[in-house]
């Protein structure tokens, strides 16, 4: 199970027949809708397609609405584009004009009052740099510092200058209301500068009755400086390296990224690393070596998710981009020592709440007993979030009651969200969670799981219970000698003669007891015996020969069926039927 999640941007490339289905099957966890482009009708058509596929495939893919935010853009040029030459003058105006090589209208009418002579203005993520020469009430006269082509609606950035524009435009408000009506799961709030911006956005969502969770996009120095308060107010963070790399000295970006990821991991909130992660795959079927390393380093740092933008929205290889992300993530995660990482994370913490301490105890318990999964049960996903915070190596299965919460959990590191029925008691809760996980195929008969939840049942935010449970009933639950495993068909014998007649190399030998006469067979087999003592002949021989042995399996000769394919797990003293 891949632990790092993949966010993919939808667009014209994903509209092609079958592409969205293949992206989901390749591992897309969150679908991002960029509301800086496209109409509500276009976004609704893509969302409807996503809804149909996630129902058909039972895939909890979250839908994320990415707002335009308080950004400044150029308006239109005659012919759609112009060429700017170093040394020429170029004017940005708040008056509505048809743009040409000498001037163009901008979307923010107060920009001339916010900048002054000597300020730098960057167009199209820094492709063209302008120096402000003078300003008037409606115009900013600039000098072009380098050659470049400029197209309609490209971004305008003013590094180091605080713009006095309101955070939420009418367009953003309309987009949020549309998203609430259509059932989006997340909103990625662009250009968040302070906690007040997050609170303003949350107020609009609350008024609309929406349960969308807010991911604050950090894209400028003000957002970076106010990260602690923003992180406290938001549900998660996006390291939006595109505009950040324009607004802030590019040499600072790696340090800022690492710090932001570390802060999010420490408080247990999801963090998305975004922008140009596999940018070359817009045109090429394979990534560059630098891109591979960029993705891997974000995963090593602990990012919850990695994001594809133009690679999937407008690139030539959207499905291949998702598969590439998936492959890099899986290989990188296989190199991480999760036990060591979890110990380091716990060691550097202040006093934990009861809920967080319970979640940490569930992680350490799962690690120490070699559990196959941690099952978290909660109404809003809080328990899963608390467990995910510690980045355990054990798979986290979030057992949930609500489909939207299930989709929202798709963004959290290491969490596999599934549905379960409502439980009215603690015993019922544990049983229902284990049954739901088994039916979903994420745990199997005989697996050992750690279940954590809140008691009393139905009270949110009360994670305080841990229980160890075995999935289903094992064929044998006895005492294992050593820690070896073995698989094979059962060979049930009641005497030495019967062993000599029936036994084949690779069989799992089941006998009432063993003697030295059976040594030639024991050397070739795993052994299950009814002898009860850990100092019995079978246990002694098993240790001496380093063979898998189960002792104390009362009634095994009578209860088990000849030829059944089984797995013998000595560490847990279990014998379970193979699927």
Where are these regions (language model features)?
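Non-catalytic helical/linker scaffolds that mediate oligomerization, partner binding
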Residues: 1-579
């Amino acid at each position: 199970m891949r632990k790092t999640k993949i966010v993919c941007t939808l667009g014209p490339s994903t509209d092609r027949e079958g592409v969205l289905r293949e992206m989901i099957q390749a591992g897309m966890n969150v679908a991002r809708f960029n509301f800086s482009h496209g109409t509500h009708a276009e976004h609704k058509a893509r969302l409807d397609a996503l809804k149909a596929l996630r129902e058909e495939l039972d895939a909890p893919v979250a839908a994320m609405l990415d707002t335009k935010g308080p950004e400044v853009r150029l308006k239109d040029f005659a012919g759609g584009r112009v060429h700017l030459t170093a040394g020429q003058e170029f004017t940005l105006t708040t008056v509505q004009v048809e743009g040409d090589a000498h001037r163009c209208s901008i979307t923010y009418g107060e920009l001339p009052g916010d900048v002054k002579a000597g300020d730098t203005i960057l167009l199209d993520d820094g492709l063209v740099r302008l120096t402000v020469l003078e300003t008037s009430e409606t115009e900013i006269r600039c000098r072009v510092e380098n050659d470049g082509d400029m197209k309609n609606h490209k971004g305008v950035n003013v590094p180091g200058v605080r713009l006095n524009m309101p955070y939420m435009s009418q367009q953003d408000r309309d987009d949020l209301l549309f998203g609430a009506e259509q059932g989006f799961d997340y909103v990625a709030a662009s250009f968040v500068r302070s906690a007040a911006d997050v609170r303003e956005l949350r107020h609009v969502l609350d008024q609309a009755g929406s349960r969308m969770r807010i991911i604050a996009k950090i894209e400028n120095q003000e957002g970076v400086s106010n990260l602690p308060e923003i992180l406290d107010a938001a549900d998660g963070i996006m390291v939006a390296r595109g505009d950040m790399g324009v607004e802030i000295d590019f040499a600072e970006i790696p340090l800022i990224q690492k710090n932001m990821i570390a802060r999010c991991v420490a408080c247990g909130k999801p963090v998305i690393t975004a922008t140009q992660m596999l940018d070359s795959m817009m045109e090429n079927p394979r990534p560059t070596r630098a891109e591979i390393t960029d993705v891997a380093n974000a995963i090593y740092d602990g990012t919850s998710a990695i994001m594809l933008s133009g690679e999937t929205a407008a690139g030539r290889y959207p499905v291949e981009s998702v598969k590439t992300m998936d492959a890099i993530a899986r290989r990188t995660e296989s190199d991480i020592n999760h036990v060591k990482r979890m110990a380091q994370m716990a060691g550097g913490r202040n006093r934990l709440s009861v809920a967080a301490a319970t979640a940490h105890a569930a992680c350490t318990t799962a690690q120490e007993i070699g559990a196959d999964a941690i099952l978290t049960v909660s109404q809003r996903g809080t328990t899963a979030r608390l467990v995910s915070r510690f980045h355990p190596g054990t798979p986290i299965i979030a057992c949930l009651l609500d489909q939207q919460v299930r989709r929202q959990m798709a963004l959290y590191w290491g969490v596999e969200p599934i549905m379960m029925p409502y439980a009215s008691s603690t015993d019922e809760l544990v049983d229902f969670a284990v049954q739901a996980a088994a039916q979903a195929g994420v745990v199997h008969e005989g697996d050992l799981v750690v279940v954590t939840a809140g008691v009393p049942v139905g009270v949110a935010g009360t994670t305080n219970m841990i229980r160890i449970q075995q999935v289903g009933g094992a064929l044998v639950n006895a005492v294992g000698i050593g820690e070896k495993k073995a698989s094979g068909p059962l060979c049930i014998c009641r005497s030495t003669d019967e062993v000599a007649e029936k036994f084949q190399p690779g069989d799992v030998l089941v006998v009432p007891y063993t003697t030295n006469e059976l040594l030639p067979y024991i050397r070739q087999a795993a052994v299950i015996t009814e002898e009860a003592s850990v100092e019995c002949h079978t246990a002694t021989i098993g240790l001496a020969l380093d063979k898998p042995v189960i002792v104390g399996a009362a009634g095994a000769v009578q209860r088990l069926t000849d030829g059944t394919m089984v797995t013998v797990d000595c560490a847990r003293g279990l014998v379970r039927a193979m699927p």
